[in-house]
Every structure is written in structure tokens, then in C-alpha cells.
């Protein structure tokens, strides 16, 4: 599983101001965005009632229109603190203990709330994409002049 958002153009590191603004917008709008309490209740916490108990991860993106979007990952697990420092934590199960949301800092929109389903928690490894493959010649080319065609030439061929 690779980690991207829709219409992603790139990534950026959110500043302290970006994080503070994302938190402010989430606090302001979480009750409305979470009005249906999907995968919450019973043994699962209702996320907007326990906001202070979650550890957070912030990942910044830019979309194709140039908007700055912060993806905020909420984790309520005292054993996940070390994982949170190393990489993006993605899980299955755990209901309201694990959820994430997106904040568009350019428009102030809070959207994309996803609360994990019920069941045992399973940490998902993040599959990293291989870098692009660069073709290289099998045999190193001897130093020489380059013809206008781009083909290396031997020094003996320098005179026509």
C-alpha cells in the first residue's frame, strides 16, 4: 500500500503554523464531519469526544491546483509512539482508536474522515515504490569526443 491522496502533485513538510491551523480547523469542524459516528460507540470511542487522547502524525501534500493539504493521522495506542516517529502508521481494525482526516489549508475544508472498522488491530506495512530505473551502458565508454549525432567516437576517427 503506497500512501497518496487524490489529485496529488507533491509533498511538503507542514510548518508549525500549518499544524496549528490544521488542528484549529479540525477542532472547529470535527463534530459536524463525524455526525454519523461511523465505526464508533459501544466499546469503540467516539473520536470527537476524546481528541486529547490521540497521538498525531501530520503529512503535507500539494494538489494539482497548488492547495496545501495536511493529512492528520490519529492513533490512540501507547505502544505506537515509537512507530509514529519512524514512518506513517497505517492499520486495520481498532475502530475509533485509529482514524485520519484531511485538511485543505488553502480553503479551510476538513474532509475525508475515515475511522477504522472493528476487529483486532493489524499494522500494515507501507510498500515503498522503487525509484525509476536508469539505463546505463554495460561497458564504460572511453573518453572521447561526441559526434553531433550523440554517438561517441574514438580519437582515431576524429579526422574525416
Give each language-model segment a name.
Residues 25-36, 104:
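Structured segments of extracytoplasmic/periplasmic soluble domains
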Residues 139-142:
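Cationic, low-complexity basic patches in intrinsically disordered or flexible, solvent-exposed regions
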Residues 1-30:
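N-terminal export/targeting and maturation segments
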Residues 35-98:
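Functional cores of ribonucleases/endoribonucleases
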Residues 95-131:
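C-terminal partner/receptor-binding element of secreted or periplasmic proteins
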